[in-house]
Regions:
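Extended, well-ordered protein cores
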Residues: 1-49, 141-210
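Compositionally biased accessory segments in Actinobacterial proteins
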Residues: 75, 83, 130, 141-143
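Short, surface-exposed beta-strand/loop "edge" segments at domain boundaries and coil↔beta transitions
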Residues: 61-65, 106-110, 137-148
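ATP/pyrophosphate-binding catalytic subdomain of soluble kinases
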Residues: 28-100
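Flexible loop/N-cap segments at domain edges
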Residues: 116-124, 128
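Short, structured protein-protein interaction patches enriched in aromatics and acidic/basic residues
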Residues: 88-118
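A structural detector for beta-sheet-dominated domains
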Residues: 102, 113, 135-137, 148-150, ...
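Short, hydrophobic/proline-enriched secondary-structure or compact coil segments at domain edges
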Residues: 127-136
Length: 210
């Protein structure tokens, strides 16, 4: 359902020893790089320890809802930050999908929201990520980090205590999958980061054993 069965199928293949390369994961590379680079800023380095919420918006053309790419993106964050699932992903009353994860005793809300989009081309594909937002809070600092899909680029911004401290853009690849397929053929070994992200993604959708 909503592409989530595919994630579990890939996970079973990886756990069975097969080498799996996923184009959706490759398409998330720029999203991952931009989000991670925001926290290289001296003011933001320690703010991930105070993360309170993760939100990912995905394209929903018509009524076609696909969540797998967003779940894999959240799974990557969970693997990097060593987050554990408290409440698996489930649909809320307002057509969003929510979950709760934790770092130690600190709980972090997760929200995946299908949205209508105006762009043409790749971003209109169901499940394409159009926005990712992280919010962190501690007694003397509030942090908001966003990566947003524009027409032909991704824009990353970070606001710390009301001040803009990061703003950078990166051009997007074309929608053609040929470069990703060629890259997959060139790789012969397991992708450790992908396997770790996939494991957390499967846990997020309800497999509490992983």
């Amino acid at each position: 359902r909503h592409g989530l069965t595919r994630l579990k199928g890939m996970a079973d293949a990886v756990y069975g020893g097969l080498v799996v390369h996923d184009v959706s994961w490759m398409r998330l590379m720029l999203w991952r790089e931009l989000l991670a680079s925001c926290f290289d800023h001296p003011l933001l380095i320690r703010e991930l320890k105070h993360l309170r919420s993760i939100r990912v918006d995905v394209a929903r053309p018509g009524g076609d809802v696909r969540l797998s790419r967003a779940v894999l993106y959240v799974g990557w964050l969970m693997s990097r930050l060593r987050l554990q699932v408290v409440e698996p992903l489930h649909e809320s009353d307002d057509e969003t999908w929510v979950a709760v994860v934790r770092s130690g005793k600190r709980r972090i809300g997760v929200e995946i929201r299908p949205v209508e989009v105006e762009f043409s081309g790749a971003v209109r594909a169901a499940g394409s990520v159009v926005r990712a937002e992280l919010e962190a809070h501690r007694s003397d600092a509030d942090t908001h980090v966003n990566v947003t899909r524009q027409a032909d680029h991704l824009l990353a911004t970070a606001v710390w205590n009301g001040a803009s401290v990061v703003r950078r853009a990166r051009a997007l690849e074309t929608f053609d999958e040929s470069p990703y397929l060629a890259d997959s053929l060139d790789r012969t070994g397991h992708d450790r980061l992908f396997a770790q992200a996939l494991e957390k993604a499967v846990a997020l959708v309800g497999d509490g054993t992983r």
